[in-house]
């Protein structure tokens, strides 16, 4: 098959693009490189630097494409609180621009990578796709809005649409920005640097941490799975882990670091875990990596965390 991957130089986008070319597919990648790194990509990926709001460029890249994976987005919950307009412009405006270009060219399927963050605070866990979203940040609002645009434009113009709500992905190569770094990568950096793993408000908040290879498996399956048009599907590990337990596991894995608890309230919902029933039924999705195994592989495969020898 011929694929276009937007956000192809990012953490998940590059892992997906590289997996697709290894499987024998033709892959075009698009990324504005605001945060991505094209060095992540296999030489077999036909990479173009550009913006998803550049319609003429999209028209060219979409020629003869069978399926689009749309990952291009701003992805920091905390940053979105500071810059909601930019998140709306990129995450919503960019998605609409891409869907219009797909309509113009006649591409028949899109897999949109959304986020478990759209659910917000939910009483019932693990959370299923039937739950009514209660987005609690501009990032979550932008992803939910983009979902509606994808599904509505797809319905009107006969484009098959699949929405994957990915939970807290982690793994080797995950970006470590100076501010608002993802918690797994941040804790690993702190531990391997003999620092303190700062845990807020007791560390009782829970998340579903899913290893990058499992996420890629779910994304790859969505391109050809039957009966998934206009479906929303969770992609996670199905395991609920507290931040405190995550910190403990990272200290055990690296044999370095210590936990520093602070009463400061960190933003975010109290609990979030994916119900994977629909993913199993529709995609045959079964995550293979426990958190302990995923952390071991992350340390083993990411040179940033190899100051500490892996036993």
What are these regions (language model features)?
Residues 52, 132, 171, 204, ...:
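Residues that form or immediately flank small-molecule/cofactor binding pockets and catalytic motifs
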Residues 1-167, 289, 301, 308-311:
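N-terminal Rossmann-like NAD(P)+-binding domain of SDR-like oxidoreductases, especially those catalyzing
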Residues 15, 57-60, 64-67, 97, ...:
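Alpha-helical elements of Rossmann-like donor-binding domains used by nucleotide-donor carbohydrate transfer enzymes
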Residues 53, 82, 90-93, 130, ...:
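Residue-level signal for the nucleotide or nucleotide-sugar donor/cofactor binding architecture
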Residues 192-311:
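C-terminal substrate-binding subdomain of Rossmann-fold SDR/epimerase-dehydratase oxidoreductases
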Residues 36-37, 120-121, 173, 243, ...:
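A short beta-to-alpha transition loop/helix N-cap that caps and shapes the active-site region
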Residues 125, 148-208, 212-221, 238, ...:
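NAD(P)-dependent short-chain dehydrogenase/reductase
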